[in-house]
Amino acid sequence: MSTDKTNQSWGGRFSEPVDAFVARFTASVDFDKRLYRHDIMGSIAHATMLAQVGVLSDAERDTIIDGLNTIQGEIEAGNFDWRVDLEDVHMNIEARLTDRIGITGKKLHTGRSRNDQVATDIRLWLRDEIDLILAEITRLQQGLLEQAEREAQTIMPGFTHLQTAQPVTFGHHLLAWFEMLSRDYERLVDCRKRTNRMPLGSAALAGTTYPIDRELTCKLLGFEAVAGNSLDGVSDRDFAIEFCAAASVAMMHLSRFSEELVLWTSAQFQFVDLPDRFCTGSSIMPQKKNPDVPELVRGKSGRVFGALTGLLTLMKGQPLAYNKDNQEDKEPLFDAADTLRDSLRAFADMIPAIKPRHAIMREAALRGFSTATDLADYLVRRGLPFRDCHEIVGHAVKYGVDTGKDLAEMSLDELRQFSDQIEQDVFAVLTLEGSVNARDHIGGTAPAQVLAAVVRGKALLASR
């Protein structure tokens, strides 16, 4: 008969119950209960393996698995009583299992520790989250390709230092976003490979004395490999840090997209219009239509950056193997994944619906001497050194600033005062269409290259 003074699974060594505040302070069930499905998945695989190696009978295995499936149904129906005094998702499920099936439920934890159990749960959860995030990236990229194809010939100003630089097509600009997201996709796929390694079987830190078959459990759970060292298996959180790093880069990209959309929807730019369903108004200013979705995505990027910093700080001082500090890994990881997925979903819904204002974009591209480089290149083709051409065009631009004329608005005589190499054919070079069409190479802004890039992009998405 037990003489424990506590109802905890580890209570045998203790002579008094945990302080009520300490129980609440140390409990993680309020946030780690979202791991229930993966915890049950891991337990079913563990029970299956224990039966295979003779630690459990087939009947015990079946009873445990039936009980776990019933518990999952209770949780999903909202009929499960989560108890803080049971600390975490693992002990809540195990206690309920024992309530349902009796002493057999107490055999499930044979050859296992919560240390390798939680490490397995998190990896299973994150693996699924990465798959969902990858799907949202692909959906957003599909929207970008569709917009880029429609806007392959829409001319807008390209910027450096947020100053007019050269004409580009709107489709070309959208494809820059596509390229960033392709790198994000690759990083997350790579992260998933290292996430998909199984720590289960490491037990507390040194392994277990039971004749477990880790390869079988690995196969049952769909992991690619077994963690090769039990100390590292229970204490490794590199995969979570790596995910938050990849998520941070992706959120940085979305934040940059957001900044451009905020600028472009302003009265000062008016390049694009966002549908009302992605905006909100003001409680005092009746005229306002605020781009809340991109603004919030821009703001939420800081949450993900904070998660990365938090996890790095969490891990930097820990000796091997598991420490209670690691309980703090879940909330930043969960929040980073939720934030990235929600932000991608918002953009994937919004991007296909944005409406470019072609005339305003074109008019903006006509300002700021955007074809100055084209004039310099024209002179280079006439045999002049580029640095001399740069100087000549600089003088022409200064003249344009003083007279209020763009280069294309100057007469041939006005242009020839800066170089007698300039002829009538220069005006074809100085048009917006001439400028973008001249950049007809892989990665260039020419409409033909934009359409070719769209074809390559569609092939990339189809190969996933």
Curated annotation (Swiss-Prot):
Pathway, per Swiss-Prot/TrEMBL?
Amino-acid biosynthesis; L-arginine biosynthesis; L-arginine from L-ornithine and carbamoyl phosphate: step 3/3
GO annotation, cellular component aspect: cytosol
From the Swiss-Prot or TrEMBL record, state where the protein is found: Cytoplasm
- EC category name: lyase
Superkingdom of this protein's organism: Bacteria
Q: Which residues form the signal peptide?
A: none
Alphabetic keyword roster = Amino-acid biosynthesis, Arginine biosynthesis, Cytoplasm, Lyase
Name its GO BP terms in alphabetical order.
arginine biosynthetic process via ornithine; L-arginine biosynthetic process
Q: Pfam families per the record?
A: ASL_C2, Lyase_1
Q: Which GO terms describe its molecular function?
A: argininosuccinate lyase activity
Q: What is its main location?
A: cytoplasm
Which transformation does this protein catalyse, written as a reaction?
2-(N(omega)-L-arginino)succinate = fumarate + L-arginine
CDD domains linked: Argininosuccinate_lyase
Q: Does the keyword Cytoplasm apply?
A: yes
Under which EC number(s) is this enzyme classified?
4.3.2.1
Family per record? Belongs to the lyase 1 family. Argininosuccinate lyase subfamily.
HAMAP family, per the entry: Arg_succ_lyase
Name under which the protein is recorded: Argininosuccinate lyase
From which organism does this entry originate?
A: Pseudomonas putida (strain W619)
Gene label: argH
